[in-house]
Amino acid sequence: MSHVLETDIAGRTLKVEYGKVGMLSNCAILVSYGDTVVLINANASKEPRDGIDFFPLSVEYEERLYSVGKIPGGFIKREGRPTENAILHARAIDRPLRPLFPKGYRNDVQIVCTVLSVESDNQPDILAMNGASLALCLSSIPFTTPVANVSVGLINGDFILNPTQSQREESILNLTVSATKERVMMIEAGAEEVDEDTMYNAIRFGFEQCQKIVEFQEEAMRRFGKEKVEPVLYLVDKDIEKEVREFAFPMVKEAMYISDKDLRNEKIDEVKEKVKEEFEEKYPENDSDISEALYKMQKEVVRNMILREKRRPDERAFDEIRKISCEVGLLPRTHGTGLFTRGLTQVMTAATIGPLADVQILDSIEDEEFKRYMHHYNFPSYSVGETRPLRGPGRREIGHGALAEKALEPLIPSEEDFPYTIRLVSEVLSSNGSTSQASVCGSTLALLDAGVPIKRPAAGIAMGLVTNDDLTEEKILTDIQGIEDFFGDMDFKVAGTEKGITALQVDTKISGLSDNCIKETLIKAKDARMYILGKIKECIPEHRAELSPYAPRVYTMTIAPEKIRDVIGAGGKTINKIIGETGVQIDIKEDGKIYVMSSDSVGANRALKMINDLTKDVEAGEIYLGKVTRTTNFGAFVEILPGKEGLVHISKLDFTRVNKVEDVVSVGDEILVKVTDIDDQGRINLSRRDAIKKEEDEKTKENNH
């Protein structure tokens, strides 16, 4: 039986259809918003997965190019691996849902969001986020807390709910808020230096707008939701936990109070070894119970240390930042490098400047088709002292790279001001928390070192939170390290400049964040950001005046659009000849703007002259140095500009009578000629005699002076 429910959100219809498709799925729904349609399927395994200590939730966001009327590019005309945007959307769906599943739930849960139709005004990712929550709520899977999601824009001081495409282009804020009825679950934002008060008010606006969607999901659950199954939860054997605690708690507490990370980890390893020796024979089948008991003790010690004793594991104050060092110009042949170190977290970023032809071409359902600025993030195993196979970037690396990219994107100069493609690569050399925000700082250093005229330096900081069980007590931590991230309740990343926020990403492990927590964290993050920006400016106050000697230079010129074909030539013959003779790269835009890129200024200037000659109009009265291309009995044809020939009549070759053209000029000779006129058919008439006379007259004038 099919069920339909509709509501109005921002003047557009949000609709869910249940029971129409996917009859064998636990829950399959079609959600639509305007003409954007996404199919959501939610399923779970019947039994918990054995031998794991985590909740195996997977979210897939499947883009179908038919949804926007496209055929995939390349030789294989079908969708392949998920695009980076699809991976980012899948992560955004996962993050607010994961904390709301029952603790100890170990069944495999998979959510598949397939984009079927896209109207550019209505974003499919926001619709998929709402649909994923709704599918879980309607299914028999033990998930009962609806999560609503909205997009917020900011135009001329007004907040816009779920902005259309034209509004998104005008907006200085792109904010996503995920919330339950009581609290904010997740925040993701890119902004053009928006101040903290405005950002907080935007989040509040988003939270309030989420409530109607929460009510919509609750109504759907009441009308046609399935009965929930009773979950089988993983629980530690209480007797084993009690024994392990009595044996190991004093040792765990002693170890967790060691401020040095390496020494603390060594001590914890010793404790684990002693626990293993003590209980291995007694409980040979209960390794997971013992490990979980040890984890709970470590977590308890760290959280009590912060909440009860008002101290941090490394003895810093709650608002204190770890020691920072900045360095630029590390690598001699790169175009720009920055090394940013904060405590035991260290990131090196390399900047590369390239021609506009190196832009990234995107084949996806998104509005954007080209990227001239990109940031990539690498997190190798050695950064945490571990070993594992080195493969391509995972979802986490893609997510961290995108966040750092978003933080700097509003600061990158326009194509008109800086006609280059820019690629940043952040290498995490050492990780002890907040590597994505260290990447923002390292990227700023690298851009300044490369001579890129960014608007202002940017910096990032990760804030944390520790709460008690009923969420009545909160301690906000500035610059969280690994242990505080691992055992804490929030990861609140803020990046921006001295003027405002450019990127924000907030995740939580609890059932949401209070208003006061969000507001206070934004204020504390600003103080930390200002401190870090001061350190960056001490290292390199502004961008270098010159690009690296190893970076290519771009030279620009503009021609009339109708002249573009003259530069390209038949089948690209002309432009390829210029490139071959000068060794440059040439990029021609539809509006007639031409970018010539080369590390050799001589070659670049030669190419510019060749293009100028190709596109320059012949003017009557001007004198040109031309080459004789052929002779006839009535005169000589002379090429005065590439592809432009004129005739010197035999009577105008010399001051005296000429009986034979070859007596004066031969094919291949370079001669001065004057354009006497251009007739209605575009034929150019030349005179060697007048050119010589004009040159002699000018010499006479100079001698008289």
Swiss-Prot record:
This is Polyribonucleotide nucleotidyltransferase. GO terms for cellular component: cytosol. Mg(2+) binds at D485, D491. It comes from Clostridium tetani (strain Massachusetts / E88). Residues 552-611 form the KH domain. It is found in: Cytoplasm. Its EC number is 2.7.7.8. Pfam families: KH_1, PNPase, RNase_PH, RNase_PH_C, S1. The keyword Transferase applies. Its main location: cytoplasm. It comes from the Bacteria. GO terms for biological process: mRNA catabolic process; RNA processing. The gene is pnp. Involved in mRNA degradation. Catalyzes the phosphorolysis of single-stranded polyribonucleotides processively in the 3'- to 5'-direction. Its cofactor is Mg(2+). One of its GO terms (molecular function) is magnesium ion binding. InterPro entries: ExoRNase_PH_dom1, ExoRNase_PH_dom2, ExoRNase_PH_dom2_sf, KH_dom, KH_dom_type_1, KH_dom_type_1_sf, NA-bd_OB-fold, PNPase. Residues 621-689 form the S1 motif domain. Belongs to the polyribonucleotide nucleotidyltransferase family. Signal peptide: none annotated. Keywords: Cytoplasm, Magnesium, Metal-binding, Nucleotidyltransferase, RNA-binding, Transferase. It catalyses: RNA(n+1) + phosphate = RNA(n) + a ribonucleoside 5'-diphosphate. HAMAP family: PNPase (MF_01595).
